[in-house]
Amino acid sequence: MKKGLIAKKLGMTQIFADDGRRIPVTVVEAGPCIVLQKKTVETDGYNAIQVGFLAKDADKSGRALVGHCKSAGQGVFTYIREFRVEDVDRYTIGDSITAEIFAPGDYVDVTGTSIGKGFQGVIKRWGFRGGRSSHGSCFHRAPGSIGSSAWPSRVFKNKKMPGQLGNERVTVQRLQVVRVDTADNLLLIRGAIPGAKNGILLLKDSVKAR
């Protein structure tokens, strides 16, 4: 069964398994997400639900957003995202989706925005080796030639050059849910997750679960 929700990254810690192994985990606040809209094959061409996360002040929101969220009767939300589902009839407008939809041992795909590191050179951005450090070298951290003059007389697209590093949408696949805290809507997910603390994440069933 397909499922997903919006979450917030709280940080990393570590837990210990029954056999004493230390497991690095990321703590994620998963929901609660409120169902705002249902989409079906008949009306939209596909089955999906639209959910909202983190309530905000209606007085500081546009009328279109307030009207859209009004049907759920749960206020206005800061983040609204859509998730494909197989059975739309399982959900009702206004339903709350929490961390309970996942269980320990499940595998999820996590999408977030990586930490922005600003304008960086080719060594940090792409892992270039660089030139000699001494003995008359004038080439230390420069990228080197980016194209000949006679041919191709231009710089090819996607050439690895200095530029913005990070601050882009990243998806990490097949991360395991180690522990679920239904009381506080927390998920402990094995390994690292893209983004800074308090960053917004999308959690979905892993496409590589099997």
Swiss-Prot record:
PROSITE patterns noted in UniProt: RIBOSOMAL_L3
Family in the record: Belongs to the universal ribosomal protein uL3 family.
Keyword Transmembrane helix appears in the UniProt entry: no
The name this protein goes by in its record: Large ribosomal subunit protein uL3
Any one Gene Ontology BP term: translation
Alphabetically ordered keywords of this record: Ribonucleoprotein, Ribosomal protein, RNA-binding, rRNA-binding
The organism of origin for this protein: Geobacter metallireducens (strain ATCC 53774 / DSM 7210 / GS-15)
UniProt-listed NCBIfam families: L3_bact
Alphabetized InterPro entries for the sequence: Ribosomal_uL3 (IPR000597), Ribosomal_uL3_bac/org-type (IPR019927), Ribosomal_uL3_CS (IPR019926), Transl_B-barrel_sf (IPR009000)
